[in-house]
C-alpha cells in the first residue's frame, strides 16, 4: 500500500514538474523602436521649415515614454539612444518619465557604445522583470572587431555600429531566450557597410547562442528593406526570418498591414513605404501576429505628433 501511495505521489510530482518545464508553450510580445536621437531632431528641424518644433526631444520625450508604455512589450529593442534620451543629461530621459507615470515593470540593458564611454546612436533592450530574468548581457560591435568600439582597417565606411544582447530566462517556463537589438549603417553612407554590419551581427550572435535549439530573436533598424544588403544577409542566413514576411506569405496579415512602411517623413507630411525596421526569429519560435504602430501622441503643447521618425513594430510569438 505504501508503495502504491509513493508511486502516486511521484506521478503527481512528475506531472507538476512537466507542466512547469520548458515544454509549456506561452505567447510573448516583442517590439523594436528607433527613437530618433535628440541631435538628429535638432539637425533636421534646422534644415526643414515644415518640421514642427514639437519634435525636439524636450517636447517629444513624454510622447515616447507614453508610447513605449502603451506598446506593453515583454521585451523591446530600442535604437538611437543618446545621453538625453537615456536621461544622463537633462531631465527628459524616457525611462524616468515612464516610471514617473507609474510604469516600473521594466528593467533596461545598455552599454556605452562610444570609444570614450559616451552614448552615440546606441542601442538598448528593455524587458518586464515579472516575465523574464536576465542571466547575461553584453555589447559587441559590427565593424569586425567585436569586443571594442573600433573598426578593422578594411571595414567599410560608417560600419562601427553596436548590437546589445541579452540571455533571458522565462520566469514561468524556465526557457532560455537570446534577444539582440541592432542598428546597421544607412546604405546611403555605405551599402557594403550595411551588409558588413549584418554579417558581423549574425556571426557573433551564432557564437553567443551556440546550439540552434536555443530560441533567439534579432530586432532593430537594419536600414534595409527586403532586397537590400543588410536584410538579405540576415534572411539569407537561413536561421533568422522576418516575422512580417512569415505572416504575409502565410496570408495571416491584414491587407492594410502589408502596405505599411515603418518610417514617416521628418516633417510628418508623408509616410514612407520603406521598411528598415525588423523583428526576425529563428525556428524555435512561431509568429502569431505583427503590427506597425502608427499612433500619434500629445507633445508638450498638447498637439499630437508621431513621437519619432520611425514607427514602432510589435509581434506576438509562440515561445
List PLM regions with ranges.
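Metal-dependent phosphoester-hydrolase catalytic domains
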Residues: 206-217, 224-319
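Positively charged n-region of N-terminal signal peptides that target proteins for export
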Residues: 1-4
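Hydrophobic h-region of N-terminal signal peptides that target proteins for export
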Residues: 10-18
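N-terminal, active-site-proximal structural segment of metallo-dependent hydrolase catalytic domains
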Residues: 19-100, 105-107, 115-120, 177, ...
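Structured beta-strand-rich core segments of catalytic domains in phosphoester-bond hydrolases
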Residues: 81-176, 292-293
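Solvent-exposed loop/turn segments at secondary-structure junctions
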Residues: 35-39, 81-85, 113-117, 130-132, ...
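Metal-dependent phosphoester/phosphodiester hydrolase catalytic core
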Residues: 133, 157-160, 167, 171-199, ...
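Active-site beta-strand/loop signature of hydrolases that rely on acidic residues for catalysis
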Residues: 30-35, 64-90, 126, 166, ...
Amino acid at each position: 500500500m505504501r508503495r502504491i501511495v509513493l508511486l502516486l505521489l511521484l506521478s503527481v510530482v512528475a506531472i507538476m514538474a512537466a507542466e512547469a518545464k520548458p515544454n509549456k508553450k506561452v505567447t510573448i510580445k516583442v517590439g523594436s523602436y528607433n527613437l530618433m536621437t535628440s541631435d538628429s531632431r535638432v539637425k533636421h528641424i534646422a534644415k526643414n521649415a515644415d518640421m514642427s518644433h514639437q519634435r525636439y526631444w524636450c517636447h517629444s520625450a513624454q510622447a515616447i515614454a507614453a508610447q513605449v508604455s502603451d506598446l506593453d512589450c515583454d521585451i523591446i529593442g530600442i535604437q538611437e539612444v543618446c545621453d538625453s534620451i537615456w536621461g544622463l543629461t537633462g531631465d527628459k530621459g524616457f525611462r524616468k518619465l515612464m516610471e514617473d507615470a507609474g510604469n516600473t515593470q521594466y528593467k533596461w540593458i545598455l552599454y556605452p557604445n562610444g570609444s570614450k564611454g559616451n552614448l552615440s546612436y546606441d542601442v538598448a533592450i528593455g524587458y518586464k522583470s515579472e516575465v523574464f530574468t536576465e542571466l547575461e548581457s553584453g555589447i559587441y560591435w559590427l565593424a569586425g572587431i567585436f569586443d571594442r568600439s573600433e573598426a578593422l582597417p578594411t571595414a567599410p565606411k560608417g560600419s562601427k555600429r553596436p548590437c546589445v544582447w541579452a540571455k533571458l530566462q522565462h520566469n514561468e517556463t524556465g526557457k532560455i531566450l537570446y534577444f539582440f537589438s541592432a542598428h546597421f549603417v544607412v546604405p546611403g553612407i555605405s551599402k557594403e557597410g550595411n551588409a558588413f554590419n549584418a554579417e558581423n551581427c549574425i556571426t557573433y550572435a551564432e557564437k553567443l547562442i551556440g546550439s540552434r535549439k536555443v530560441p533567439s530573436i534579432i530586432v532593430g533598424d537594419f536600414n534595409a528593406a527586403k532586397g537590400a544588403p543588410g536584410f538579405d544577409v540576415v534572411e539569407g542566413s537561413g536561421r533568422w526570418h522576418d516575422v512580417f514576411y512569415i505572416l504575409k506569405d502565410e496570408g495571416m496579415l491584414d491587407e492594410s498591414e502589408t502596405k505599411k512602411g515603418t518610417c514617416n517623413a521628418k516633417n510628418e507630411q508623408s509616410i514612407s513605404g520603406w521598411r528598415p525596421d525588423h523583428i526576425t526569429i529563428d525556428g524555435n519560435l512561431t509568429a502569431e501576429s505583427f503590427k506597425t504602430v502608427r499612433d500619434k501622441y500629445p507633445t508638450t503643447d498638447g498637439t499630437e505628433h508621431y513621437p519619432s521618425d520611425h514607427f514602432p513594430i510589435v509581434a506576438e510569438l509562440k515561445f
